Structures are given as C-alpha cells and as structure tokens.
C-alpha cells in the first residue's frame, strides 16, 4: 500500500467510524501518562504525540498542565476530531501537524517523543529506518522516547492493515545506540468491543 493509499485508508476510517468504534480507543491513556511522568520532566517540557490524531492523551496532558504539546497524525480528520473535542480555546494551545512521520521534517526538538500504536503499522524496513532517523533528529541527547506497539503475542492486523509485533529489544535495535532502554512494560488493552489486545511499551 502506497503512502497515498494509506492516508486515504485512515481518512476514510475516521470519517466513517466514531471513536468508540475503533479498537485502539482509550477513555484514559493511563500507561502513556505514567511513562511520561516517569521521565521526571516539568510541565514546560516539549512533547510530541506521533499518530495521536484522535487520542485523548492530549486532553490529559493539558489537564496536567503541559504547555508545549504537538500532535502529529497522517489523518486531517483525526486531528479535527481532537480539535472539536477540546474546543477552540484548548485546541489553540496545541500544535497540530498533518503529516506522514516517515517523510516529516522536524522543525524543533522535543523532550518526549510518544507513540502509541503508530509505529507498528510501518511494515516496510525503509519506513522504519526513516522513522528512526526522525527520532534522532527530533529528540536531543537526554530526551525521552516512548513507543507502544502490539506485543509479540498481540494481534497481527489492525483496522484491516498488517502490523509488526515487537518487544523492547527489537525496538532498541531499530532506534540504535543513541537511546538506552529505561523501562519496558506489557499491557492488556481492552477494546470497546471487549477484546483484549497485548501491547508492549518501551521507554528510552
């Protein structure tokens, strides 16, 4: 599937399904928040949420007082969903970026790079290498990277697309020696349909 076809797939999905109709929906992004807190950073830290289009993590970060938040997603519709949910006042506090992360050009540095369930859709090694290159360019020494994917015993497909399942060692290998693993967790995510999906989260 080309990048254009992938974008069309996600635009169609967000236009035709409500947030409770997608398997990755979380009312509260508890694990992500715990891992971000574990970095020990203050609320003026810059955070980017990759693939966070319609996620409620941005809501939770604003509630905790974070003031330098960027949300990047391939889908314009997903970003519009979050903007509408937040309301104009809160949405204006966030930088919104509609882009393919593998082709995106970072324009600033981020203290935290967070990704829940975007990276595992990159099935082409070239795309994974491009992703890792963006991480290296966007996260300075001393910065933090948090990546959540389906675990080795997690689903093989999501929303009609194939995924790559990971453990922390595999993600470490892709990111390279610039990032040291600080913490790894497995997590059973219960979908709105009542199905348990095994995730792994790695914090570098």
Regions found by a protein language model. Give the residues of each.
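Class I (Rossmann-like) S-adenosyl-L-methionine-dependent methyltransferase catalytic domain
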Residues: 1-108, 122-138, 143-204
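Conserved acidic residues
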Residues: 111
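A conserved beta-strand element that flanks and buttresses the S-adenosyl-L-methionine
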Residues: 114
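Short catalytic micro-motifs in class I SAM-dependent methyltransferases
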Residues: 117-121
């Amino acid at each position: 599937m080309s990048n254009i076809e992938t974008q069309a797939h996600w635009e169609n999905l967000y236009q035709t399904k409500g947030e409770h109709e997608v398997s990755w929906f979380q009312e509260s992004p508890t694990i992500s928040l715990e891992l971000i807190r574990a970095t020990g950073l203050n609320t003026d830290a810059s955070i980017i949420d990759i693939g966070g289009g319609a996620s409620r993590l941005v809501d939770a970060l604003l509630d905790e007082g974070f003031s330098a938040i960027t949300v990047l997603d391939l889908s314009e519709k997903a970003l519009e969903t979050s903007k509408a949910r937040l309301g104009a006042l809160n949405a204006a506090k966030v930088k919104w970026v509609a882009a393919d992360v593998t082709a995106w050009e970072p324009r600033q540095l981020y203290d935290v790079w967070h990704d829940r369930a975007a990276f595992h859709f990159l099935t082409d090694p070239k795309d994974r290498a491009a992703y890792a290159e963006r991480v290296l360019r966007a996260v300075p020494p001393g910065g933090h990277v948090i990546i959540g994917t389906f675990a080795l015993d997690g689903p093989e497909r999501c929303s009609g697309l194939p995924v790559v399942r990971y453990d922390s060692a595999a993600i470490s290998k892709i990111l390279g020696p610039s990032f040291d693993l600080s913490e790894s967790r497995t997590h059973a995510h219960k979908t709105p349909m009542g199905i348990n999906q095994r995730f792994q989260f790695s914090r570098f």
